[in-house]
UniProtKB/Swiss-Prot annotation:
Nonselective cationic channel with high permeability to Ca(2+). Component of a mechanosensitive cation channel. Confers mechanically activated (MA) currents with slow inactivation kinetics. May contribute to proprioception. The chain crosses the membrane at residues 10-30, 65-85, 98-118, 131-151, 169-189, 193-213. One of its GO terms (cellular component) is plasma membrane. It is found in: Cell membrane; Lysosome membrane. Keywords: Cell membrane, Lysosome, Membrane, Transmembrane, Transmembrane helix. One of its GO terms (molecular function) is mechanosensitive monoatomic cation channel activity. Belongs to the DRAM/TMEM150 family. The lineage of its organism: Eukaryota, Metazoa, Chordata, Craniata, Vertebrata. It comes from Rattus norvegicus (Rat). This is Transmembrane protein 150C.
Amino acid sequence: MDGKKCSVWMFLPLVFTLFTSAGLWIVYFIAVEDDKILPLNSAARKSGVKHAPYISFAGDDPPASCVFSQVMNMAAFLALVVAVLRFIQLKPKVLNPWLNISGLVALCLASFGMTLLGNFQLTNDEEIHNVGTSLTFGFGTLTCWIQAALTLKVNIKNEGRRAGIPRVILSAVITLCVVLYFILMAQDIHMYAARVQWGLVMCFLAYFGTLAVEFRHYRYEIVCSEYQENFLSFSESLSEASEYQTDQV
Protein backbone atom coordinates (compact mmCIF):
# COMPACT_ATOMS: atom_id res chain seq x y z
CA MET A 1 0.00 0.00 0.00
CA ASP A 2 1.50 3.31 -1.14
CA GLY A 3 0.86 5.85 1.60
CA LYS A 4 1.26 8.75 -0.84
CA LYS A 5 -1.70 7.51 -2.89
CA CYS A 6 -3.99 6.80 0.05
CA SER A 7 -6.82 9.10 1.05
CA VAL A 8 -6.83 10.36 4.63
CA TRP A 9 -10.38 9.01 4.87
CA MET A 10 -8.95 5.53 5.27
CA PHE A 11 -8.16 6.46 8.86
CA LEU A 12 -11.82 6.99 9.77
CA PRO A 13 -12.72 3.26 10.08
CA LEU A 14 -9.39 2.63 11.82
CA VAL A 15 -10.02 5.42 14.34
CA PHE A 16 -13.50 3.99 14.96
CA THR A 17 -12.06 0.54 15.61
CA LEU A 18 -9.12 1.61 17.77
CA PHE A 19 -10.99 4.27 19.76
CA THR A 20 -13.98 2.06 20.55
CA SER A 21 -11.96 -1.03 21.46
CA ALA A 22 -9.59 0.99 23.66
CA GLY A 23 -12.53 2.73 25.35
CA LEU A 24 -14.32 -0.53 26.11
CA TRP A 25 -11.20 -2.09 27.59
CA ILE A 26 -10.71 0.98 29.78
CA VAL A 27 -14.27 0.50 31.04
CA TYR A 28 -13.50 -3.17 31.73
CA PHE A 29 -10.34 -2.45 33.71
CA ILE A 30 -12.06 0.27 35.76
CA ALA A 31 -14.88 -2.14 36.65
CA VAL A 32 -12.44 -4.92 37.56
CA GLU A 33 -10.39 -2.54 39.70
CA ASP A 34 -13.55 -1.48 41.56
CA ASP A 35 -14.60 -5.12 42.06
CA LYS A 36 -17.81 -4.61 40.09
CA ILE A 37 -17.18 -7.54 37.75
CA LEU A 38 -15.05 -10.67 37.61
CA PRO A 39 -11.95 -10.68 35.38
CA LEU A 40 -12.44 -12.50 32.10
CA ASN A 41 -9.82 -15.09 33.06
CA SER A 42 -11.40 -15.77 36.44
CA ALA A 43 -12.28 -19.39 37.15
CA ALA A 44 -14.25 -18.79 40.35
CA ARG A 45 -16.32 -16.02 41.89
CA LYS A 46 -14.46 -13.72 44.26
CA SER A 47 -16.08 -12.54 47.46
CA GLY A 48 -17.61 -9.09 47.08
CA VAL A 49 -17.75 -9.24 43.28
CA LYS A 50 -21.30 -9.02 41.99
CA HIS A 51 -21.34 -9.80 38.29
CA ALA A 52 -19.85 -11.78 35.43
CA PRO A 53 -17.75 -9.57 33.12
CA TYR A 54 -20.48 -8.61 30.64
CA ILE A 55 -19.88 -5.28 28.96
CA SER A 56 -23.22 -4.00 30.25
CA PHE A 57 -22.24 -4.80 33.85
CA ALA A 58 -18.80 -3.28 33.36
CA GLY A 59 -20.35 0.02 32.30
CA ASP A 60 -23.19 -0.03 34.83
CA ASP A 61 -21.77 1.94 37.78
CA PRO A 62 -19.73 5.15 37.93
CA PRO A 63 -17.00 5.99 37.15
CA ALA A 64 -16.98 3.25 34.50
CA SER A 65 -20.52 4.15 33.39
CA CYS A 66 -19.41 7.71 32.56
CA VAL A 67 -16.62 6.44 30.33
CA PHE A 68 -18.92 3.82 28.81
CA SER A 69 -21.56 6.40 27.84
CA GLN A 70 -18.99 8.67 26.24
CA VAL A 71 -17.36 5.81 24.33
CA MET A 72 -20.67 4.51 23.00
CA ASN A 73 -21.87 7.97 21.96
CA MET A 74 -18.65 8.66 20.06
CA ALA A 75 -18.73 5.17 18.53
CA ALA A 76 -22.32 5.68 17.40
CA PHE A 77 -21.42 9.00 15.76
CA LEU A 78 -18.38 7.56 13.97
CA ALA A 79 -20.38 4.52 12.84
CA LEU A 80 -23.07 6.82 11.44
CA VAL A 81 -20.47 8.81 9.49
CA VAL A 82 -18.96 5.58 8.15
CA ALA A 83 -22.43 4.38 7.13
CA VAL A 84 -23.17 7.54 5.14
CA LEU A 85 -19.76 7.66 3.44
CA ARG A 86 -19.94 3.97 2.56
CA PHE A 87 -23.39 4.51 1.03
CA ILE A 88 -22.11 7.46 -1.03
CA GLN A 89 -19.07 5.43 -2.10
CA LEU A 90 -21.15 2.54 -3.44
CA LYS A 91 -24.13 4.50 -4.79
CA PRO A 92 -22.82 5.06 -8.36
CA LYS A 93 -21.46 1.51 -8.59
CA VAL A 94 -24.53 -0.60 -7.77
CA LEU A 95 -27.27 -1.23 -10.33
CA ASN A 96 -29.84 -2.27 -7.73
CA PRO A 97 -29.77 0.33 -4.94
CA TRP A 98 -31.81 -1.64 -2.42
CA LEU A 99 -28.90 -3.60 -1.02
CA ASN A 100 -26.89 -0.42 -0.53
CA ILE A 101 -29.87 1.35 1.07
CA SER A 102 -30.42 -1.65 3.34
CA GLY A 103 -26.80 -1.47 4.46
CA LEU A 104 -27.18 2.22 5.30
CA VAL A 105 -30.42 1.71 7.24
CA ALA A 106 -29.08 -1.31 9.13
CA LEU A 107 -25.93 0.49 10.28
CA CYS A 108 -27.92 3.59 11.25
CA LEU A 109 -30.21 1.45 13.42
CA ALA A 110 -27.18 -0.27 14.96
CA SER A 111 -25.72 3.17 15.73
CA PHE A 112 -28.98 4.20 17.39
CA GLY A 113 -28.81 1.02 19.45
CA MET A 114 -25.32 2.00 20.63
CA THR A 115 -26.67 5.26 22.04
CA LEU A 116 -29.45 3.43 23.88
CA LEU A 117 -27.23 0.86 25.56
CA GLY A 118 -24.62 3.51 26.35
CA ASN A 119 -26.96 6.06 27.92
CA PHE A 120 -29.48 3.77 29.60
CA GLN A 121 -27.49 1.61 32.00
CA LEU A 122 -28.72 -1.88 32.75
CA THR A 123 -29.82 -1.28 36.35
CA ASN A 124 -31.41 2.10 35.55
CA ASP A 125 -33.60 1.01 32.64
CA GLU A 126 -33.12 -2.63 31.73
CA GLU A 127 -35.81 -2.70 29.04
CA ILE A 128 -34.41 0.18 26.96
CA HIS A 129 -30.87 -1.09 27.50
CA ASN A 130 -31.82 -4.52 26.16
CA VAL A 131 -33.56 -2.93 23.17
CA GLY A 132 -30.32 -1.10 22.41
CA THR A 133 -28.33 -4.32 22.73
CA SER A 134 -30.71 -6.11 20.35
CA LEU A 135 -30.52 -3.29 17.80
CA THR A 136 -26.72 -3.16 17.98
CA PHE A 137 -26.10 -6.89 17.72
CA GLY A 138 -29.00 -7.68 15.37
CA PHE A 139 -28.60 -4.92 12.81
CA GLY A 140 -24.82 -4.92 13.28
CA THR A 141 -24.71 -8.56 12.18
CA LEU A 142 -27.02 -7.81 9.25
CA THR A 143 -24.76 -4.91 8.24
CA CYS A 144 -21.73 -7.20 8.16
CA TRP A 145 -23.38 -9.63 5.75
CA ILE A 146 -24.72 -6.84 3.52
CA GLN A 147 -21.35 -5.11 3.30
CA ALA A 148 -19.60 -8.42 2.59
CA ALA A 149 -22.00 -9.06 -0.29
CA LEU A 150 -21.54 -5.52 -1.62
CA THR A 151 -17.77 -5.86 -1.40
CA LEU A 152 -17.76 -8.96 -3.59
CA LYS A 153 -20.37 -7.55 -5.97
CA VAL A 154 -18.89 -4.08 -6.55
CA ASN A 155 -15.24 -5.21 -6.57
CA ILE A 156 -13.64 -1.77 -6.14
CA LYS A 157 -10.19 -1.60 -7.77
CA ASN A 158 -10.36 -5.39 -8.28
CA GLU A 159 -9.93 -5.84 -4.51
CA GLY A 160 -13.35 -7.39 -3.98
CA ARG A 161 -12.13 -10.89 -3.19
CA ARG A 162 -9.20 -9.72 -1.07
CA ALA A 163 -11.48 -7.62 1.14
CA GLY A 164 -14.68 -9.62 0.71
CA ILE A 165 -13.50 -13.07 1.78
CA PRO A 166 -12.17 -11.90 5.19
CA ARG A 167 -15.46 -10.05 5.68
CA VAL A 168 -17.48 -13.16 4.91
CA ILE A 169 -15.36 -15.09 7.44
CA LEU A 170 -15.78 -12.36 10.07
CA SER A 171 -19.53 -12.23 9.38
CA ALA A 172 -19.78 -15.98 9.92
CA VAL A 173 -17.78 -15.75 13.16
CA ILE A 174 -19.96 -12.86 14.37
CA THR A 175 -23.15 -14.78 13.58
CA LEU A 176 -21.83 -17.85 15.37
CA CYS A 177 -20.88 -15.73 18.40
CA VAL A 178 -24.35 -14.16 18.54
CA VAL A 179 -26.04 -17.58 18.50
CA LEU A 180 -23.59 -19.03 21.02
CA TYR A 181 -23.96 -15.99 23.28
CA PHE A 182 -27.73 -16.37 23.58
CA ILE A 183 -27.45 -20.14 24.07
CA LEU A 184 -24.99 -19.70 26.94
CA MET A 185 -27.11 -16.92 28.42
CA ALA A 186 -30.19 -19.15 28.36
CA GLN A 187 -28.28 -21.89 30.19
CA ASP A 188 -26.89 -19.44 32.81
CA ILE A 189 -23.28 -20.16 31.81
CA HIS A 190 -22.39 -16.55 32.37
CA MET A 191 -18.59 -16.57 32.42
CA TYR A 192 -18.38 -18.20 29.00
CA ALA A 193 -21.22 -16.04 27.68
CA ALA A 194 -19.34 -12.91 28.77
CA ARG A 195 -16.17 -14.08 27.03
CA VAL A 196 -18.12 -14.78 23.85
CA GLN A 197 -19.67 -11.31 24.09
CA TRP A 198 -16.26 -9.64 24.27
CA GLY A 199 -15.04 -11.73 21.35
CA LEU A 200 -18.17 -10.79 19.39
CA VAL A 201 -17.65 -7.06 19.96
CA MET A 202 -13.97 -7.23 19.01
CA CYS A 203 -14.90 -9.05 15.78
CA PHE A 204 -17.44 -6.32 15.02
CA LEU A 205 -14.80 -3.64 15.50
CA ALA A 206 -12.21 -5.53 13.44
CA TYR A 207 -14.77 -5.88 10.64
CA PHE A 208 -15.39 -2.15 10.37
CA GLY A 209 -11.67 -1.50 10.45
CA THR A 210 -11.41 -3.40 7.16
CA LEU A 211 -13.41 -0.66 5.42
CA ALA A 212 -10.16 1.30 5.32
CA VAL A 213 -9.24 -0.88 2.32
CA GLU A 214 -11.85 0.85 0.11
CA PHE A 215 -11.83 4.21 1.86
CA ARG A 216 -8.19 4.73 0.92
CA HIS A 217 -9.23 5.12 -2.74
CA TYR A 218 -11.77 7.90 -2.16
CA ARG A 219 -11.77 11.57 -1.28
CA TYR A 220 -14.87 13.23 0.15
CA GLU A 221 -15.62 16.95 0.02
CA ILE A 222 -18.30 19.16 1.58
CA VAL A 223 -19.40 21.92 -0.80
CA CYS A 224 -20.85 25.06 0.75
CA SER A 225 -22.58 27.71 -1.39
CA GLU A 226 -24.58 30.79 -0.46
CA TYR A 227 -28.32 30.53 -1.04
CA GLN A 228 -29.57 33.22 -3.45
CA GLU A 229 -33.24 34.05 -3.14
CA ASN A 230 -33.47 35.67 -6.57
CA PHE A 231 -31.57 32.98 -8.42
CA LEU A 232 -31.16 33.63 -12.14
CA SER A 233 -30.70 30.91 -14.71
CA PHE A 234 -27.72 30.95 -17.04
CA SER A 235 -29.83 32.15 -19.98
CA GLU A 236 -31.39 34.94 -17.90
CA SER A 237 -27.94 36.05 -16.78
CA LEU A 238 -26.74 36.22 -20.40
CA SER A 239 -29.85 38.17 -21.37
CA GLU A 240 -29.29 40.75 -18.63
CA ALA A 241 -25.63 41.03 -19.55
CA SER A 242 -26.45 41.69 -23.23
CA GLU A 243 -29.05 44.32 -22.30
CA TYR A 244 -26.51 46.05 -20.07
CA GLN A 245 -23.94 46.09 -22.87
CA THR A 246 -26.55 47.54 -25.29
CA ASP A 247 -27.38 50.32 -22.84
CA GLN A 248 -23.71 51.16 -22.50
CA VAL A 249 -23.35 51.46 -26.28
